[in-house]
């Protein structure tokens, strides 16, 4: 039976998850067991271990393996302007509406959070769009973009702002030449855009902080949390959504992944902005 399989996966993975919690403080117990089994299984094969018990012994006696396992579990696949339709809507409808309302209210602060930002492509994409919009409107605004992730290595890469061609292939040529400089086969984001994004380590299941500590108080105008909820069971999805809800200012925007939606406890607190895209407004 499926439930028996799930229970067995939880049983055999628990010692490994407990060890990760003990050594690094990351709680993966709310992640989907099947996903964890697949990703940990990749390291089991790579280390030639015959089962999860043997792999745990390897993990406990090979310090470098811990980082390799975390890399596999928190795998970060992203690129600039990933999901072109979503970013077209952000550029053409969402950001202009937010900025125009800010200008009308004489509110010169714009606060954005990119949760699970990986190597920074998503928040940097937003920084580029905001720069272009403010330049077009001839408007000045204090822009605060916060990118968070649980992967230290990914955040270190984000801080370097140096990307291979595969990461920037979705960027229009005009924006690429304007906001990046070529370095060999890679592209480096210019300092004026890079400085707009603040990166920090943050676990969405952190029980101590409802919002990223670096952001101080949340109250975001715009939050992106794409393709993160799909990794969690419903109990942990509710925990994450509670944070997202609390972090958003009234009438602000939340963007989820294509296969994601507000959890049952929070559906009535959000209205869909676009029928064909997972863009929601807090009500």
What spans do the regions from the language model cover?
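Conserved AdoMet
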Residues: 2-113, 257
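Conserved class I S-adenosyl-L-methionine
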Residues: 107-120, 125, 144-146
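A short glycine-rich, Lys/Arg-flanked "PGG" loop and its adjoining helix->strand segment in the class I
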Residues: 238-250
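Extended basic-aromatic, gly/pro-enriched interface segments that bind polyanionic ligands
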Residues: 115, 136-224, 228-232, 236, ...
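Conserved SAM-binding loop of SAM-dependent methyltransferases across substrates and taxa
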Residues: 119-138
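Conserved beta-strand signature within the Rossmann-like core of class I S-adenosyl-L-methionine
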Residues: 250-258
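Core SAM-dependent methyltransferase catalytic element
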Residues: 222, 264-283
């Amino acid at each position: 039976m499926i439930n028996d399989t799930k229970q067995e996966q939880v049983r055999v993975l628990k010692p490994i998850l407990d060890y990760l919690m003990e050594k690094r403080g990351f709680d993966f117990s709310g992640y989907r067991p099947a996903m964890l089994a697949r990703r940990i299984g990749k390291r089991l094969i790579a280390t030639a271990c015959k089962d999860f018990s043997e792999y745990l012994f390897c993990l406990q006696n090979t310090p470098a393996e811990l980082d390799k396992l975390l890399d596999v579990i928190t795998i970060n696949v992203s690129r600039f302007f990933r999901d072109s339709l979503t970013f077209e809507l952000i550029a053409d409808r969402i950001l202009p509406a937010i900025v125009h309302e800010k200008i009308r209210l004489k509110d010169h602060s714009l606060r954005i959070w990119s949760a699970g930002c990986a190597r920074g492509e998503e928040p940097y994409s937003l920084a580029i769009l905001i720069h272009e919009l403010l330049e077009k409107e001839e408007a000045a605004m204090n822009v605060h973009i916060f990118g968070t992730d649980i992967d230290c290595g990914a955040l270190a890469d984000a801080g370097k702002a140096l990307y291979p061609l595969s990461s920037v292939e979705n960027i229009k040529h005009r924006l690429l030449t304007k906001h990046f400089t070529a370095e060999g086969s890679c592209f480096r984001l210019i300092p004026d855009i890079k400085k707009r994004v603040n990166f920090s380590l943050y676990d969405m299941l952190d029980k101590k902080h409802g919002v990223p500590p670096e952001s101080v108080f949340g109250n975001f105008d715009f939050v992106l949390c794409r393709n993160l909820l799909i990794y969690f069971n419903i109990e942990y999805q509710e925990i994450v959504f509670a944070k997202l809800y609390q972090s958003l200012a009234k009438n602000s925007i939340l963007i989820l992944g294509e296969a994601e939606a507000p959890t049952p406890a929070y559906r009535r607190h959000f209205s869909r902005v676009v029928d064909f895209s997972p863009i929601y407004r807090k009500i």
